[in-house]
Amino acid sequence: MKDNTVPLKLIALLANGEFHSGEQLGETLGMSRAAINKHIQTLRDWGVDVFTVPGKGYSLPEPIQLLNAKQILGQLDGGSVAVLPVIDSTNQYLLDRIGELKSGDACIAEYQQAGRGRRGRKWFSPFGANLYLSMFWRLEQGPAAAIGLSLVIGIVMAEVLRKLGADKVRVKWPNDLYLQDRKLAGILVELTGKTGDAAQIVIGAGINMAMRRVEESVVNQGWITLQEAGINLDRNTLAAMLIRELRAALELFEQEGLAPYLSRWEKLDNFINRPVKLIIGDKEIFGISRGIDKQGALLLEQDGIIKPWMGGEISLRSAEK
């Protein structure tokens, strides 16, 4: 495992957005300017924009707020939350420790080296720019009871963001949040467990907060950040509130399933009563979205007939001209 101590100290010094000379940084960290430059490159590899201005030194384009475990844990009533600077993926971190976790245990990271989205896709995860959060839950009723879970997670995330001031956030079937018709957040639910056995579930969420650019090869749809929409939220408050609300929602979901959430989905549905297309492999199916049914399937109207659609291979997009 690479030692990230120095780059992490460096980012903490640069986090205020001011200029810092290589000399100053070298003195503080007890190393040469050349060594500082090498660690600056690590930060760039993590997706951090570090400017270099001759005669002034290094600076970030704007201050960044780093995650603070003490602040996050101080807003929660117990349960374990790992706050990690650099990790392969928050979901993988929990999956690797599944035997020792309790329902509601969570993990948050500044940077994911191998973040992943639905269908094994890469999830673009620059350092300190977004929120990457995963939570473990053990569903005693088994894997079949998890149907509709990603919808519940989406509703909770949208409601939390709205409470904190991002009041135009909406949900998109089956596992995204949208703002201004662009993707703001994604959800990945990973499940292990056999039929007749409890399901071990790891829920991952990534929220775009302030990233400035993306790798086009990784992001295949229009995206937006809270910052671009003029919304600046405290990352630590957001993380704590999400963990608290997700724990409560998962308890309710365990007892009552999707039923209590159906009307909440309808209020937040980004595409309800709008022309959409479903993409399944290389096939496109056009119709009007009519919300979801009791199982969480997407209801699509074609020629006056409404049919439910369900499945991990379906993508939903707008079909408005």
From Swiss-Prot:
Lineage summary: Bacteria, Pseudomonadati, Pseudomonadota, Gammaproteobacteria, Enterobacterales
Keywords associated with the record: ATP-binding, Biotin, DNA-binding, Ligase, Nucleotide-binding, Repressor, Transcription, Transcription regulation
HAMAP family: Bifunct_BirA (MF_00978)
One Pfam family recorded for the sequence: HTH_11
GO cellular component: cytoplasm; transcription repressor complex
Binding site for biotin: 89-91, 112, 116-118, 183
Main enzyme class: ligase
Outcome reported for the amino acid change (mutating residue 52 to S): 5-fold increase of repressor activity. Increases binding to DNA
SUPFAM superfamilies: C-terminal domain of transcriptional repressors (SSF50037), Class II aaRS and biotin synthetases (SSF55681), Winged helix' DNA-binding domain (SSF46785)
Protein name from the UniProt record: Bifunctional ligase/repressor BirA
UniProt note on regulation of activity: The switch between the enzymatic activity and the repressor activity is regulated by cellular demand for biotin. The switch occurs by swapping of protein interaction partners by holoBirA. In conditions of high biotin demand, holoBirA associates with apoBCCP to transfer biotin. In conditions of low biotin demand, holoBirA dimerizes, binds DNA and represses transcription of the biotin operon.
GO aspect biological process, one term: biotin biosynthetic process
Organism of this sequence: Escherichia coli (strain K12)
NCBIfam families per the UniProt record, alphabetical: birA_ligase, birA_repr_reg, PRK11886.1-2, PRK11886.1-4
Domain notes: Contains an N-terminal helix-turn-helix DNA-binding domain, connected via a linker to the central catalytic domain and the C-terminal domain, which plays roles in dimerization, catalytic function and DNA binding. The N-terminal domain is required for both ligase and repressor activities. It may orient the active site and thereby play an important role in enzymatic activity.
Family from the record: Belongs to the biotin--protein ligase family.
GO molecular function, one term: transcription cis-regulatory region binding
Function (record text): Acts both as a biotin--[acetyl-CoA-carboxylase] ligase and a biotin-operon repressor. In the presence of ATP, BirA activates biotin to form the BirA-biotinyl-5'-adenylate (BirA-bio-5'-AMP or holoBirA) complex. HoloBirA can either transfer the biotinyl moiety to the biotin carboxyl carrier protein (BCCP) subunit of acetyl-CoA carboxylase, or bind to the biotin operator site and inhibit transcription of the operon.
Catalytic activity, reaction form: biotin + L-lysyl-[protein] + ATP = N(6)-biotinyl-L-lysyl-[protein] + AMP + diphosphate + H(+)
Subunit description: Monomer in solution. Interacts with BCCP. Homodimerizes to bind DNA. Interaction with the corepressor bio-5'-AMP increases dimerization.
DNA-binding region (UniProt annotation): 22-41
Gene expressing this chain: birA
EC number per UniProt: 6.3.4.15
InterPro entries: aa-tRNA-synth_II/BPL/LPL, Bifunct_BirA, Biotin_CoA_COase_ligase, Biotin_operon_repress_HTH, BPL_C, BPL_LPL_catalytic, HTH_11, Transcriptional_repressor_C
Keyword Transmembrane helix (UniProt): no
